[in-house]
Amino acid sequence: MQLSTTTHEQATLVNQKDTYLLIVFDSAGTAVLVESQGNEYHLPKIEIPKFTRPAQEVTELLRNVWKLSSVFLFSGVVEESANASYFAVLESTDGLCLHPQGIEWFTIHHALSSLPFSKHECRAVRLSHAKLRRRIYKNSSEPFARLGWMQELKDWVDSNIRPLGMELRSLQQLNGCETFSLVRFATTQQPVWFKAVGEPNLHEFSISHALRKFFPRYVPNIIATKYEWHGWLMSDGGGATLDETSNPLAWQTAIATLADLQIESIGTIDDLLEAGCRDLRAPTLLELVDPFLDTMAELMNQQTTVPPPVLSRQELSHLSETIKDALQCLSALQISDSLGHSDFNPGNIIVGPEGCTFIDWAEAHVSHPFLTFEYFLSHLRKDYPTVVPFEDDLRSSYARRWQGCSSAEHVSEAFLFSPLVAVFAYAVAGNRWREQECVKIPQVPGYLRSLTRRMKREAEMLQRRRVECPN
């Protein structure tokens, strides 16, 4: 769930750029690409749009502009540099004969000992090369921070799809770091996808396999599993993502399919929790209300500017009572806990001719089902204005499914209490609020305070709705 931003703020974010120094090694790890201008030598520097996937943006830029095939290995923050914010380490898979104009290959030793690099460039190359050398062994806990892993992956994918009558054609690296990878492989038939996860999302590996076991109709088919990388190869969903269409029927189909999945999941709650789904059921949330709001009281006292308003202890106390009441009322309704998703956004919903499939379950949880519907609405209101007029139709589609196993009155009441509970559950789900190191990050306290103010607004609207519709 993301808070709304103004059109001006959105336009500003779209136009912002991140600057990256590129450290491109050859596949043997013996040479690095260096840009030369007369007697000056520097690491190449590029800009990519802010808030995008660096692995995808950087590798596509190198392919389209430099005509160079590359693999994104890892990235980091550049220290003591006013000219770049980050560095990206890549492997060129085209050999030493290919390089863009004005950029040459130099041996690592020569580059570090003889070229007039700046201090931060020299440090970045030296540390990156040392990191690659430490990751030579294949049993590393960081499998994607080493040279040659993509070729190994291609061979593994090829060996698993050939028996299915498919052959590899090309690949697109969409996301990645030392422990995480997302690669799309084009084949002679439909595409296949490889995904691997590490901490803090290691649970997605077991969750994805559990969902495939219990609900194969709703998730992509898993073709093969690479256990040592916590990765799996899956088939394509066979359609477009929901965010690519404004057809209200497609959106209604997606939300009705979500309800079907949730209803089917009711009998598998223990299995889902064992697989790693987060427990956001009412008893768990009730225990977190006071600890969370006590922490928010401390963060409110740290706020130095007004507006936005600082919530008083008394306001937080009233909010605590309202959240607890909403949780108790919601759990009293005859609607069972089910599978849910704290980031249920249209980009993770694939709409095909035979129905919908859902991908990316890192934020899977077990909770009251209507919380997931609220997260879906939050994305819709923020990013899809052309679909907002159909919100009532979506609500009706979702409600009709649940009225098959609960009364219409209980479904209506669940819609009353779920907006407030959804914001609270989202705020406490990741435990960032009680991790001292996390709270020290400048943006985190402000974000948590904004979520708390959002809860207060939802609590006030809940009280008004209960007065207007007492029955």
Regions found by a protein language model. Name each.
Residues 2-44, 70-71, 350-352, 357-360:
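N-terminal strand-loop-strand
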Residues 34, 171-188, 193-194, 321-373:
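Active-site acidic catalytic loop and adjacent metal/ATP-binding pocket
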Residues 245-313, 337, 442-450:
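A cross-family kinase active-site recognition segment
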Residues 369-406, 419-439:
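Active-site activation/catalytic loop segments of kinase-like enzymes and analogous catalytic loops
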